[in-house]
From Swiss-Prot:
UniProt organism field: Simian immunodeficiency virus agm.grivet (isolate AGM gr-1)
Stretches with biased composition (Low complexity): 111-120
Swiss-Prot/TrEMBL GO biological process terms: mRNA transport
Name of the protein in question: Protein Rev
Assembly mode: Homomultimer; when bound to the RRE. Multimeric assembly is essential for activity.
Short name of any one Pfam family annotated for the protein: REV
Principal subcellular localization: host cell
Cell compartments where the protein resides: Host nucleus, Host nucleolus; Host cytoplasm
Length: 147
């Protein structure tokens, strides 16, 4: 894998950062050595953060370049024209038809305004049949219940 010019520059910066903070070779009292190590550790954490920012900046620039490349490659693509969604039937009041629970399963009473019997699909809770919220469903159930 060959490195590009920007990658080499980023690695050179990171190498310089880490080379600028060698581990302390200090003689002295235990307290002086401990403080020197603590200072080194804090500086090393700062260098780690800076190196992370350098790499993230490089990766972000690389990502932006890749996105621009993709945009150029795909600029000629056109979305297909999709068909219109199915039309929702509305009655004269402007209220759309909905699916709602109707009669319990096993009941052969008419549960739709067309007068057909219903075979429940939800077990004992009932089935789903298209009805209108305007109240015509209740009227059709009453008329279907009368023999």
């Amino acid at each position: 894998m060959s490195l590009g010019k920007e990658e080499k520059q980023a690695l050179k910066i990171i190498k310089t950062l880490y080379g600028s903070n060698p581990y302390p070779q200090f003689s002295g009292t235990a307290r002086q050595r401990r403080r020197a190590r603590q200072r080194w550790r804090k500086q090393q954490q700062q260098i780690d953060k800076i190196a992370g920012r350098v790499l993230n900046t490089f990766e972000d620039q690389q990502l932006v370049a890749q996105l621009q490349e993709l945009q150029l490659e795909n600029k000629d693509l056109v979305l297909q024209h999709l068909p219109d969604p199915p039309h929702i039937h509305q009655d004269s009041s402007g209220i759309p038809a909905v699916w709602a629970p109707a009669t319990p399963r096993g009941s052969n009473r008419a549960c739709s305004s067309s007068g057909e019997g219903c075979e429940g699909s939800l077990g004992q809770t009932g089935c789903y049949c298209p009805i209108r919220l305007s109240g015509s469903h209740q009227q059709s159930k009453k008329s279907a219940a009368r023999p």
